Regions:
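Heme-based O2/NO sensor domains and their adjacent alpha-helical segments
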Residues: 2-8, 19-108, 112-118, 125, ...
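Short, solvent-exposed beta-strand/turn "edge" segments of beta-rich domains on protein surfaces
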Residues: 11-16
């Protein structure tokens, strides 16, 4: 018997839930003593773009690469030269998980394991790329995809 397993996007609550999550999250970020200065000049539509990016990564519609005209390289470019550090990375994750709890994002162990795995992976990549002066990937690199399974092995810089 085959199971009909939803995508992380579907399980999270989809577009409306992700938009709400990132809107409320970035409201908190702007008020945060550590993260506020990093994001004080963010574009008004930044939370929407991040919701579209994460939605697409989690198996949802291609709104980030479609209507937003984004790409993985463009998302990485937003982090170049930001000089993020471990304290900021951990605070970013903490605020996002707190916001997820507050709005009732699913808290079953399987989903939260996948969510936290993605946040750990993505935020560590953001810190690495924030130390760069040039984008390490090209415009043709595919968008990341995240699901319920395991990673593809350790991160090894090129």
């Amino acid at each position: 018997m085959e199971k009909n397993i939803p995508t992380l996007y579907e399980w999270s609550g989809g577009e409306e839930t992700l938009q709400r999550l990132f809107r409320l999250f970035y409201d908190k970020v702007l008020q945060d003593e550590l993260l506020g200065p990093v994001f004080r000049n963010m574009a008004k539509d930044h939370p929407r773009h991040v919701a579209h990016f994460v939605g697409e990564v989690f198996g949802g519609p291609t709104k980030y690469t479609g209507e937003d005209k984004g790409s993985h390289a463009i998302m990485i470019a937003h982090h170049i030269g930001k000089m993020l550090d471990e304290k900021k990375r951990q605070r970013w994750i903490q605020l996002l998980l707190t916001t997820a709890d507050e709005i009732g994002i699913p808290d079953d162990p399987e989903f939260r394991s996948s969510l936290l795995g993605y946040l750990e992976w993505g935020s560590r990549i953001a810190v690495i790329n924030s130390q760069q002066t040039e984008n390490p990937i090209g415009e043709t690199e595919p968008m990341p995809r995240w699901g319920w399974g395991e990673t593809g092995g350790p991160y090894v810089p090129k």
